[in-house]
């Protein structure tokens, strides 16, 4: 059975819901397809129990569902965030087909796209890919060399310390998720080994404001791929947390409090983890990242003539005294769990045509495909700006898409 409909939105996360809201405000025919049973599934099922929103509540800017609570500078829990998605979808009666997995999107010569699900097919003029940028959890190729007696999984499967087998834990990756999970584990009494990367340290608050206020006010997240420096293009979310009122995460502090810091992982040979001797280098990059962040904030404050009291941030050096460990016998160290915090990758496999540019980003300035009429991307960083992946810009991003949909006319049934 083939149903004709003007627009199909794939994904019922924040970008998909915001696009649906805007289309409904204009009376445009559409449907959201989502494989889960409720909206915001990645937040619901791929975040740990104590997860809190990393950006302050005031940044929750779903159009028509902006944060209106009593704590704009606080941080929502996972469950509160999910409840807001549910209430939003119910309040606006958004047309969502849950438990509906899209298996392919094909071009139909001269007349749009054919979207196939396990049960049904849709002929549509417009497809809005709103599945987000962070889809498939990454693991290194040598993950299968980890001894079978050791439990291993991606951060998306982590829930709490109590759910893990007894013993030490190796966390591979020190970005936001890896650092937050490592902190929770060692604070719960676990022995934690943390293989570091190059995510920058950053102050949670600086010169009287939260880091997100400075990122927003300074225009940093408004920059396009072309406008950003190489470091900006390789933007790695800084080590901060929204837990316990919000705080900075710092590898030197982790070291002081008992975590064992390592360089980045290279391989597993005969049950031993092979590590690069680059812990000090990684720490240096993390520290330099913070210096660059605050340097940019200071320059903006001066440029804008703002009255913001000067602040000297604490200087931590503990990690530089840690030994460079290049081989780690997992079983001898009592490590019974490995958590891969290596980030995510985008999965374009449902699309039966190619649309990625040389940088691996959809060729879609403003979220609007340059090559395929009626193909749109919502909620992806750099489409059009870095902030497109944040709640802060979800309304701005989707409004551009909806304007183009409206301008394309209605689908002839």
Q: What is each stretch, according to the model?
A:
Residues 46-73, 211-228:
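N-terminal glycine-rich dinucleotide-binding loop that anchors FAD/FMN and/or NAD(P) in oxidoreductases
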Residues 2-37, 41-42, 76-413:
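Flavin (primarily FAD) cofactor-binding/catalytic cores of flavoenzymes
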């Amino acid at each position: 059975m083939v149903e004709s409909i003007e627009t199909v939105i794939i994904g019922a996360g924040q970008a998909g819901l915001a696009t649906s809201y805007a289309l409904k405000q204009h009376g445009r025919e559409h449907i959201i397809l989502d494989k889960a049973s409720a909206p915001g599934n990645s937040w619901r099922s791929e975040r740990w129990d104590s997860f809190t929103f990393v950006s302050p509540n005031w940044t929750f800017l779903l159009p028509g569902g902006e944060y209106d609570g009593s704590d704009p500078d606080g941080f929502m829990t996972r469950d509160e965030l999910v409840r807001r998605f549910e209430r939003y979808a119910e309040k606006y009666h958004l047309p969502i087909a849950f438990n509906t997995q899209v298996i392919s999107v094909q071009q139909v010569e001269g007349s749009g796209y054919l979207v196939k699900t396990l049960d049904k097919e849709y002929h549509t003029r417009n497809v809005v890919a709103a599945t987000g940028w962070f889809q498939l959890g990454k693991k290194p190729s040598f993950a299968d060399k980890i001894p079978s007696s050791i439990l291993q999984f991606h951060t998306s499967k982590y829930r709490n310390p109590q759910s893990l087998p007894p013993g030490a834990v190796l966390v591979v990756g020190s970005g936001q998720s890896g650092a937050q999970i490592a902190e929770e584990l060692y604070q719960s009494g676990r022995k934690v080994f943390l293989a570091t990367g190059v995510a920058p340290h950053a102050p949670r608050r600086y010169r009287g404001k939260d880091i997100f206020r400075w990122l927003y006010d300074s225009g940093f997240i408004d920059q396009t791929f072309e406008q950003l420096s190489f470091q900006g293009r390789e933007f790695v979310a800084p080590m901060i947390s929204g837990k316990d009122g919000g705080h900075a995460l710092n590898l030197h502090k982790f070291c002081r409090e008992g975590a064992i810091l390592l360089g980045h992982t290279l391989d597993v040979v005969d049950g031993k983890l092979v590590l690069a001797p680059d812990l000090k280098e990684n720490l240096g990059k993390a520290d330099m990242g913070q210096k660059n962040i605050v340097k940019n904030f200071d320059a903006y404050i001066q440029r804008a003539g703002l009255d913001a009291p000067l602040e000297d941030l604490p200087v931590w050096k503990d990690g530089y005294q840690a030994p460079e460990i290049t081989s780690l016998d997992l079983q001898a160290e009592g490590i019974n769990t490995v958590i891969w915090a290596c980030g995510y990758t985008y999965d374009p496999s449902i699309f039966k045509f190619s649309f990625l540019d040389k940088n691996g980003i959809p060729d879609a300035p403003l979220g609007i495909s340059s090559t395929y009429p009626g193909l749109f991307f919502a909620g992806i960083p750099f489409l059009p700006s870095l902030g497109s992946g944040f709640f802060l810009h979800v309304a701005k991003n989707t409004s551009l898409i909806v304007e183009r949909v409206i301008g394309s006319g209605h689908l002839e049934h």
